[in-house]
Swiss-Prot record:
Enzyme Commission numbers on file: 6.1.1.19
Chain location of the short sequence motif 'HIGH' region per the record: 111-121
Protein name per UniProt: Arginine--tRNA ligase
Catalytic reactions on record: tRNA(Arg) + L-arginine + ATP = L-arginyl-tRNA(Arg) + AMP + diphosphate
Keyword tags: Aminoacyl-tRNA synthetase, ATP-binding, Cytoplasm, Ligase, Nucleotide-binding, Protein biosynthesis
PROSITE patterns: AA_TRNA_LIGASE_I
Gene Ontology CC annotations of this record: cytoplasm
Underlying gene: argS
GO terms under biological process: arginyl-tRNA aminoacylation
Subcellular locations according to the entry: Cytoplasm
InterPro entries hit by this protein: aa-tRNA-synth_I_CS, Arg-tRNA-ligase, Arg-tRNA-synth_N, Arg-tRNA-synth_N_sf, ArgRS_core, DALR_anticod-bd, Rossmann-like_a/b/a_fold, tRNAsynth_Ia_anticodon-bd
Amino acid sequence: MKDKVKAEISKVLEREFVLEKPKDKNLAHYATPLFSLAKELRKSPAMIASEFADKFSDSKIVEASAVNGYLNFKLKSEFLDEISKQILLDSENFAKEDAKKDSYLIEYISANPTGPLHIGHVRGAVYGDTLARLGKRLGYAISTEYYINDAGNQIDLLGTSISLAAKEQLFNESVVYPEKYYRGDYILDIAKLANEKFGKEIFYDESRNLELAEFGKDIVLEIIKKDLADVGIFIESWASEKALYDGLEPTINKLKRSNQMYEKEGATYIASTTLGDDNDRVVVRNDGRPTYLAGDIIYHNAKFEKNFDHYINIWGADHHGYIARLKAAINFLGYDENRLEVILMQMVSLLKEGKPYKMSKRAGNAVLMSDIASEIGAEALRFIFISKANTSSLEFDVDELKKEDSSNPIFYINYAHARINQIFAKAGKSVSDVINADFECLDENSKNLLFEALILPEILEDAFASRQLQKIPDYLKSLAASFHKFYNENRVVGNENEDSLLKVFAVVAVSIKTAFNIMGITAKDRM
């Protein structure tokens, strides 16, 4: 819709222009400031606006008016009717764009495969999945990936933790736990399964600790995949750090060719300070063992070899200091580091009845993703975790998301969608019955509600471009509020313009359903 409006304006202005959306839709749907033309045309902005406004008299798309140096535009009824009819005839493809050339690889979650996903992972999981869904809707080629950190000390520690749990809780032995270890019911469950498969001996043979750890890792990954599937998240590619380590030597050699590596006290460094890092970073320790950074460099080299146009990593905010060293390494590998975008997720605080949410016994000392999903439902989880900008911390009370009133945003939006279905039922009509109703009879309030429903594609484009996904739930809350207000103030069924108003409502319902679908939520027809 906006593109058609811009094309119409461009035919008259014949130059670049800015198209704004005034806050007050009663003034205009769109507006263009003309102050920059005053010097070029040697006229006042008000006179320029007035002269241009006259040139839109024959437009079938917009009505133009001059206001204080602005060209104000309102969409004509016949254009609103045309757009609305197209949407209702093909509602499944509303806000769905043709294929674009740009491709993206989005990596998110990438939690250690040593335990179930907890609250610290949920925000990135929901954000990443929603960003991928949104990008696909907008026509981008999107692939998703989970990087499995399965080559570090944490995997050895997983095996040790399983052995200790087995000795203490299966065989009633007294054990001494290290300062750091994995605990929780899931560790005991893995120990029981290992005992059934391998027998008791595996817990006492240190040479088999890695075998035990790999067994545990595979089970944890299945738990992670199930927890994600339960909230509608399905990641396409799972990249193992361990499997990539064959690429260590060729990747190091590639880095050396950049002349940005050096040896110091037996260790191998990259000169990341040359590209803005605080310190140069060790890639290979003096005992020959690669660092955590080395694993990430190998992984990103493998990523960039896939030749996507853009790479997006979604990390916790505590990884902020890691960005410069990784981007430096990507540059030294010969790639454009600006093709990598890192999006950081701020902390989440979860409350229940105003108090901190109880930790899960199954995870030892964490609030599990599966617990939250069970408590409030997968769809409420998906909604609330992108309801605020990722750059801000998020705090919410699970009890608020169980309320069936306007204080619960997902209920309020769903109620709007269900209410529209109820209104159609009350009128005894379907969308096909009203699709040819015209909009000439509509007043400004009706047209403003319709316009708000029609701008969803603009909201989606903006949300993807800015990476501010909270703009989608914000839009839905606003649209639902506008609909409820309009319906509470106007008689629809029995109105002389009933069919036209029902047609407006049908478009509102399509917008809600479409936006919810991108968020991984199913709009309710009944409540």
